[in-house]
Amino acid sequence: MTFGDWPPQRRIGLTGGIASGKSSVAALLEKRGCPVLDADVYAREALATDTSASKAVVARYGKRVQKDGTSDIDRAELAAIVFNDPNERSWLEQLVHPIVQRRFDDALRSLPDAPIVILMIPLLFEAGLEKWCSEIWVVRCTALQQRERLMARNNCTEAEATQRIAAQWPIDIKVQRADSVINNSGRIDDLHDQLDALL
């Protein structure tokens, strides 16, 4: 589907650095009546037990990426592999991204009358999906906040958090490519004000 095929609709690509607060922003937008399509949800579904993608992951990495006694993918173990090796990360992205894109396509086709749809895509720029969006919003916070939030959320070390942040494009590059930038380093009231202005 090309942008010219779409109905008149604001398709807002919501992206930003890992642990910058994209989900918090998306939740506020959803409360304002905007449907939110989440790439992370689609990626998790793509790697659900016994899907073709999960079988390909097990075939490549073996039982070490399976939770003990189950066929489920151990996402923490898989993350440890791909964040330590750019080649493996690229392989996984090439496996999962086409599946995620098909899910987005199907979901967008089901929402022709929605005036605004939010496409929450952490790797929007990295995956070259700008063409899917009529505008792009980048969520950012301070580097210290990002690292501390990631460590708390993922229960990881500072070194692991730094590694995961470095695996994505630098936030300054994303900001340069954004139509709008949302500063999520302050109070929740400030966040509400920014969203009200953008909508």
From Swiss-Prot:
Pathway annotation: Cofactor biosynthesis; coenzyme A biosynthesis; CoA from (R)-pantothenate: step 5/5
Annotated EC: 2.7.1.24
InterPro entries in UniProt: Depp_CoAkinase (IPR001977), P-loop_NTPase (IPR027417)
Localization in the cell: Cytoplasm
Membrane-crossing segments per the record: none
Domain DPCK: 11-199
GO cellular component: cytoplasm
Chain sites annotated for binding ATP: A19, S20, G21, K22, S23, S24
Major site of localization recorded for this protein: cytoplasm
Protein known as: Dephospho-CoA kinase
Source organism of this protein record: Synechococcus sp. (strain CC9902)
Gene (UniProt): coaE
